[in-house]
Amino acid sequence: MQLNGAEILIECLKEQGVDTVFGYPGGAILNVYDELYKHSNEIRHILTSHEQGASHAADGYARATGKVGVCFATSGPGATNLVTGIATAFMDSIPIVAITCNVGVPLLGKDSFQEIDITGITMPITKYNFIVKNVNDLAKTIRKAFEIAQSGRPGPVLIDIPKDVTGNKAEYEPVKIQPIVKYKKEICMEDIDKAVEMIEEAKRPFVFVGGGAILSDASEELRAFVDKVQCPVCDSLMGKGAFPGTDELYTGMLGMHGTKTSNFGVSESDLLIVVGARFSDRVTGNPNKFASNAKILQFDIDVAEMNKNVIIDEGVVGDIKEVLATVNEKLPQQEHTEWIKKIQEYKAKYPLAYHPESLTGPYVIEEIYKQTEGDAIIVTEVGQHQMWAAQYYKFTKPRTLLTSGGLGTMGYGLGAAIGAKMGRPEKTVVNIAGDGCFRMNMNEVATAARYNIPIIQVVVNNHVLGMVRQWQNLFYGQRYSATVLNDAVDFVKLAEAMGAKAVRATTREEFADAFKFALNAGGPVVIDCQIDSDDKVWPMVAPGAPISEAFDEKDLQEKQQTN
């Protein structure tokens, strides 16, 4: 049948099972929005306050559901406003499809009004991108974009469609979309045998879990693997929830703000089994001294991650779910009683701790955990509050911590929380932000209010850019350059002005009451938590130091006393 480009686009989205799109209209994309209007009962559109919010919402939707997130933007500044969100998704391997419309084909390359080369701009931050200049190519391009976004190592794909293409007609034949095969090559069984042999020989194995285990939906296989190996487990920020944070073998996060137990344990292990992690600098500390006593065995879907940041001894390339299932079939039951006992002693000796008297970031996280019974989707911005959330909320399920781990995007959380709630409406969704991050995209409070999306926005408000100030305090002679937010911004009044409910908390009791209110409010709520600007994230690894030199507040005080 003959359809115009806008009709073909909407039909192809329906083929892919798309039920929600986040975006912002404009002149170049008007044909698409006109067609979307006719299908509003099948595809709901969430009008964000800014295109960056739309890209983050698509990202949050994808992380929470495991499906592809979709965002729309018009040409020029509409398209460029998506860039930060696309880059965020790219760094964390999140499948989104960003659809932009450009000026008509005859106007391309002529500096036309709102013309921009968005495919050129996004080439380094997309898995693939397309500009469709012929309507006859549109349907196959959209189908290909969704396949690329989901297969192999996931990632964002951009499709740029000139306006005249959305109006031109072509033959459209609907197709039934087949399930995506994530990894099409067979796993090398010789590599599997080597992996099993290394595990059997190890006396002090340690499992390190990254976001790849979540992207592969491999939590069940991971738990079975750990049961077989019988060894301690740590994770990266992106791996939170892949392995239950309440399990006896779990030791916490690894790296710069990881637990001493994880950092010391990995440093003393003789085999580090890496499951879907990329060895970022935030994990390894000094890479030349990382896990220096251990052989390293890496499981990953992307061969490019092998020997990229850390030299490994053996690797198995493949979908994590399939790799673990195959290893589990071949691996005999292991036992490492003495090694586990030593790690448990570390856990008892080096617990996470914070000042118990006042309203602090860690208390806020623990109270959220208590009231949500560990069953919420937690979204964070970037900074101290992000680390506190990773440390003090015990994540037991995958896709329950949504955070910008690679790009470290301030302003990510509120849009992502909206996307997560639209994808998982049955879940409590909480976005935790610092006051600096909240300012970046707080206009999305109006979006949540417009659609009465019941997300809870917790602002951990210390009136400074906390993480940067912490570094200035420890490593820059307490010279607080541009990190003190001396102003009179009232987040409660701002939230109320945008149509949300809001409350301020200055004590523990006030926060507990405020969060209880937010859980039952039936709409968006902003909680402004006033905490001390001197609160810090502990433990910490100094820049350039090995993770075996992780220190906390007590260590720092003892060092200052001896000096």
Model-derived features with residue positions:
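Generic hydrophobic/aromatic pocket-lining and core-packing "Φ" positions
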Residues: 10, 86, 142, 416-417, ...
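Phosphate/pyrophosphate-binding active-site segments
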Residues: 136, 293-384, 508-512, 517, ...
